[in-house]
Amino acid sequence: MSDKVYTVQDYKSGQPRWCPGCGDHAFLNSLHKAMAELGVAPHNIAVISGIGCSSRLPYYVNTYGFHTIHGRAAAVATGAKVANPDLTIWPISGDGDGLAIGGNHFIHAVRRNIDLNMILLNNRIYGLTKGQYSPTSERGFVSKSSPYGTVEDPFHPAELAFGARGRFFARCIAVDGAASVEVLKAAANHKGASVVEVLQNCVIFNDGTHASVATKEGRAKNAIYLEHGKPMLFGENKEFGLMQEGFGLKVVKLGENGITEKDILIHDAHCQDNTLQLKLALMEGPDFPIALGVIREVEAPTYNDAVAEQIEEVKGKKKYHNFQELLMTNDTWEVK
């Protein structure tokens, strides 16, 4: 963190070229605010993207950035972090870019636990290429590439992250700026691979895809904000809660059948066993609320630290410590 106090303006760059009403606008505002509150100097940040609407984001942040090729944000970010561990790196991908052609890089970056703030902007559609179904589009979704409806099940980003032994998973919705800022800050402060799924709208090709939680009123009824150490309550007046039932979960109403707040599950984001956390991450309407906030956050050694330690260990055992020293051994000649 820098001694200088930064403002949102320090992180802004250029005029975003997205459709009016695109969820990318709201997310970008949250990212600017999160960066300002984190206080990391712009020259110590790199924003790295692949290809897609959301992948234009590096142009609109006044930091270092790479607009790479399709699906390769996590791969390039891995190299950048290992080469310069002091950088704060934000790989940003859409659901198509990150989970289709980039899916392999995504799961291995998570598995290796590289210290990256991995953002997945999920609007369940390919937007830049004008409306084809993506790996997160729902079964039966009608699009230009599935005119009669898709006949395949979608990926759940949480399931991929958890399956790759992810240590941090959080979810927010782009239009909820205050909550998004807090989630982004938590991701940045976590040491290791942080995966944040951002639910966002595509007003042109998949309008209303997250309609149930798109408004404040909708989120009160259909979403639950999880906070570590606090009871899992939701509803306009926090009148509903989550309890365990067998190996699953159930929604209960406080006051009915003698149920009180003491009966409600307490969220433990730091539990090493991810069984309950994954159940929370996979909840869907209409039977369950959609989980928002930090769902899982546990500590583990990072890949970039392990690589740096290994290099120092090997150098300590070798006569020559770098390539230049090796070149200058024995007889040398200077050609003029």
PLM feature spans:
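Conserved thiamine diphosphate
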Residues: 86, 134-187
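Active-site diphosphate/adenylate-binding microenvironment
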Residues: 5-69
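ATP/pyrophosphate-binding catalytic subdomain of soluble kinases
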Residues: 168-225
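Flexible, low-complexity linker and terminal segments
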Residues: 2-4, 13-14, 204-336
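Short coil/turn connectors at secondary-structure junctions
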Residues: 14, 41-45, 83-89, 111-117, ...
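Glycine-rich beta-alpha junction loops
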Residues: 51-53, 123-125, 176, 199-204, ...
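Thiamine diphosphate
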Residues: 51-127
